[in-house]
Amino acid sequence: MSVTHIIGAGLAGLSAAVAITHAGGRVKIYEASAMAGGRARSYHDKKLGIEIDNGNHMLLSGNHSAKTYLKRIGAEHRFKSPKEAAFSFCDLSDKERFTIKLSNGPLPWWVLCAKSRVPHSKAKDYLALLSLLLADHNTKIGDLVPDNTALWRKLLDPFFVSVLNTPAREGAACLAAAVIRETLMKGGKACIPRIAYPNLASSFIDPALDYLKARGVEVDFRNRLRQIHFSGQDVASLEFAHQDVKLGKGDKVIIALPAWVVQSLIPDIETPDKYQAIINAHFLMKPTAAMPHIMGVVGGTADWIFTFENRISVTISAANHLLALEKEELVKRIWDDIQTVYAFKQDMPEWQVVTEKRATFEATVEQNNRRPPAVTAWNNLFLAGNWVRTGLPATIESAIRSGQTAADLALSHS
C-alpha cells in the first residue's frame, strides 16, 4: 500500500493524518520539534508550576471541520461551553457591561431586541454586515462597514480583530464574510463558544496522537525536513536531518509547515509573507465562581479574558503594536484590565507571557491573495496549514480543514 508522508505535526498535519488513517490509508508523520501541536500546544511552565497553553483558542459550535476531527479522535466532550450563544463584554472606556445574545435560528431576531444587541446600536446598523457578503477578494472591511457606530466600536471591531488577527479596517472583507456565513448566518446554535478544557493538548493533540498510535502510527519527532528532491513533476525523495526517504510508487507528500518554512523548501511558491503577533498572558490565580469563563474587553489592552481552574488567561490579537513594549509594563496594563473587568483589587500574582510573533499571516487583501491552493505544481505534493487558501482566516477551523482537504487530495490521486 502506498504511503502519505506528512511533514509537520501541528493541527493541519494531525488533521490530515487522522483523515487518511480514518479512510484506511497509511501515513508517516515527521516533526522537527520535540512535541506535536504547533501553535495549539500545551506545556508545563516552570515559573508558574502548572500546565498552560501557548495561546487561547476559541472554537464555535458551527466549526464543522473541527467537529468532524474531534468526533473521529473521540474528543468532542473535552470542552467547556455555555448552553447558548451569549457573549459578555466590558467596555473600559465607559465601564458599560453588556451581553450579546444571539437567536438560536438563522433569523436574527436578536438584532430587533434592544436588550440582546449592542448598547446604543440600532437595528439598521447591522445591515452593513450584508455588504460584506457581496465583497470580492480585493475589498477591505473598512471600505464597506462604517467605523463611527457603537456597533463597530463595541462589537465588530473586536470581533474582526479576533477572527482575522489583523486590524479590523484593514482586514479582507471576503474572509470576514466567510466567518459570518459559517457562524452568524446559521444562528446562535452555530455560534456557541467552545473552549478546550483543561488545555489545548488534552482536547486537540493528545487524543489525535492516541488515535493514530492505536492504528500503528507514531510521530517521528526531532526530525527536520531539510530538502525536497524533485524528479520531473513528482517528489522523488525527502532529505531529513537523520535520514533520506525515497518515495515509492503511489506515495504522496503533505507539507504542513509554516509558510516561511515552505518558501525555503518549494521553489517559486508564493505564500503570505507578512504576519501579526498574538500575545497571551497567564496569571496564577484561582478565579471566583462569579467570573465568566469568557469575557470580551473593549477599549483596553486585553481583548479576551478566559478563566480556568488554576489561572486567568488573557489574549491580545493583532499585537504587533505591543511587541516593543517592556514585558513588565505590558503585564501591568493587562492586570489593570482584569481588575477593572472583575471589580477587585489585589497584588499581581505570578505571571507568564507567551508571545507568538508570527502567529498568523496578516489577513489583508494583499496577503490573502498570496495564499496558495492545496495542490501544487507537483503531482504527489500537497499543502496544508491555516495559511493555505481555505477561504477562511488563519483559525483552528482553517488549519483542520486544510488538513482534511490535503488528505482528500492525497487519497484521490492514484
UniProtKB/Swiss-Prot annotation:
EC category: oxidoreductase
Heme is among the record's keywords: no
Reactions performed catalytically: squalene + FAD + H2O + H(+) = hydroxysqualene + FADH2
Pathway: Secondary metabolite biosynthesis; hopanoid biosynthesis
Function: Involved in the biosynthesis of the hopanoid precursor squalene (SQ) from farnesyl diphosphate (FPP). Catalyzes the third (last) step, the reduction of hydroxysqualene (HSQ) to SQ.
PANTHER family recorded: BLR3003 PROTEIN (PTHR42923:SF47), PROTOPORPHYRINOGEN OXIDASE (PTHR42923)
The keyword Amino-acid biosynthesis is annotated on this UniProt entry: no
InterPro entries linked to this entry: Amino_oxidase, FAD/NAD-bd_sf, SQase_HpnE, Zeta_carotene_desat/Oxidored
Disulfide bonds: none
Pfam families: Amino_oxidase
Originating species: Zymomonas mobilis subsp. mobilis (strain ATCC 31821 / ZM4 / CP4)
Keyword entries, A-Z: FAD, Flavoprotein, Oxidoreductase
Entry's family note: Belongs to the HpnE family.
Secretion signal span: none
EC number per UniProt: 1.17.8.1
GO molecular function: oxidoreductase activity
Name of this protein: Hydroxysqualene dehydroxylase
Gene3D superfamilies, alphabetized: FAD/NAD(P)-binding domain (3.50.50.60)
